């Protein structure tokens, strides 16, 4: 059988390109090394609860085009992301807002909060030299020590004094009693989970799971849309790109309500995990049991652990730019998505990127990879 496109990866970028190309009659084959579609957005129903297998995914966007497009494939509920921080068994509202400051200092006005932060941040004189100094200068030492230091050091597996200040360019502080984590116009969780979206996108398209692009026998001499790690594609010839990664331990709990909220951030460094996720709260499941996940940062080992978050520091950006230059020379391959572009994408951003790619290939009838 002949194909027009081989798409490597059944996450959002690959699945959207497949859908749009298939819609205009192109013959497409999609492969994925995992045993399921959906990439890191994959959800799995357990006890009438849709488990976010690779960690919580809350859809949010202010992009009207993206919102309208994704609603073809799912009905979204009215879930609003309001995580809570746990530090030494005391709870604080997130993101930093007047509830947080009331819980921390008893402050009830913007003036009080600004005075406290200004006094605490004044200990940093001159230009901050590292992440710790940058954070203290922005929000003071109480907020830093309680809600930032331990969580950040667990995420990066390094002391905050060793981390570059550029990681925290700014810290959003709200002087209102508003716990909504996102500022976007639209927000929610697809009713029935994310996997159903991918099943609809890939309906009628040949999909091969458990298929490794580098070892499987695949159609040759056709155009490729590659959404895997770009450094792996080029045989790591410029070095391996770094990622932050986590392990998730999923556990069934025989209670109808374990923690009362979808996500709790654990900011105490002595607690090894960074988050606990109670999945039933995403869709308000009435299941008599609950599924809870413990998320713990681990060392990233290429091809052994899952790459989650690109480490876009100067060193890794320099390596990526070499791969990007190589990608520009590939006349039949386009690199897309978080791994293919070594870029942190929220879901709405990767959807917009994939739609633009598909538009270029579909309606403009041109092929300009990697521009």
Report the location of each language-model feature.
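N-terminal Rossmann-like FAD-binding beta1-loop-alpha1 element of flavoenzymes
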Residues: 3-30, 358
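Short, solvent-exposed loop/turn segments at secondary-structure junctions
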Residues: 12-13, 35-36, 99, 153-154, ...
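Short, well-ordered alpha-helices that flank and scaffold nucleotide-derived cofactor binding pockets
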Residues: 19, 23, 43, 203, ...
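Glycine-rich FAD pyrophosphate-binding loop
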Residues: 22-47
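N-terminal glycine-rich dinucleotide-binding loop that anchors FAD/FMN and/or NAD(P) in oxidoreductases
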Residues: 43-69
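A short alpha-helix-loop-beta-strand transition element characteristic
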Residues: 66-88, 143-146
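Active-site/ligand-binding neighborhood in enzyme catalytic cores
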Residues: 85-222, 227, 232-234
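C-terminal segments that line or cap access tunnels to active or ligand-binding sites in enzymes
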Residues: 222, 232-370
């Amino acid at each position: 059988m002949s194909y027009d496109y081989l798409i490597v990866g059944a996450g959002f970028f690959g699945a959207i390109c497949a859908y749009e190309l298939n819609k205009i009659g192109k013959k497409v084959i999609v492969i994925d090394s995992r045993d399921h579609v959906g990439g890191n957005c994959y959800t799995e129903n357990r006890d009438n609860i849709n488990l976010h297998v690779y960690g919580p995914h809350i859809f949010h966007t202010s992009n009207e085009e993206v919102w309208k497009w994704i609603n073809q494939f799912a009905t979204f509920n009215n879930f609003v992301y309001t995580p809570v921080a746990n530090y030494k068994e005391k709870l604080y509202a997130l993101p930093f807002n007047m509830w947080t400051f009331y819980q921390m200092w008893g402050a009830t006005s913007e003036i009080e909060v600004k005075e406290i932060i200004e006094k605490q941040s004044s200990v940093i004189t001159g230009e901050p030299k590292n992440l710790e100094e940058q954070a203290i200068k922005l929000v003071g030492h109480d907020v830093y020590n309680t809600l930032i230091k331990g969580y950040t050091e667990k995420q990066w597996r390094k002391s905050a004094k060793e981390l570059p200040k550029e990681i925290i360019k700014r810290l959003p502080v709200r002087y209102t009693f508003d716990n909504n984590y996102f500022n976007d116009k639209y927000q929610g969780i697809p009713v029935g989970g994310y996997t159903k979206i991918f099943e609809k996108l890939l309906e009628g398209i040949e999909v091969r799971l458990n298929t490794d692009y580098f070892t499987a026998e695949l159609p040759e001499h056709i155009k490729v849309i590659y959404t895997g790690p770009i450094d792996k594609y080029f045989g790591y010839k410029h070095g391996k790109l770094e990622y932050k990664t986590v392990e998730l331990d999923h556990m069934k709990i025989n209670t109808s309500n374990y923690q009362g909220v979808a996500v709790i951030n654990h900011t105490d460094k002595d607690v090894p995990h960074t988050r606990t996720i109670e999945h039933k709260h995403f869709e308000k499941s009435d299941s008599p049991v609950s599924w809870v996940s413990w998320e713990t940062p681990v060392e990233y080992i290429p091809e052994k652990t899952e790459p989650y978050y690109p480490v876009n520091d100067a060193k890794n950006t320099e390596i990526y730019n070499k791969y990007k230059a190589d990608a520009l020379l590939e006349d039949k391959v386009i690199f897309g998505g978080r791994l293919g572009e070594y870029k942190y994408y929220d879901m709405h951003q990767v959807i917009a990127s994939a739609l633009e790619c598909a538009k270029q290939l579909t309606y403009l009838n041109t092929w300009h990879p990697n521009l």
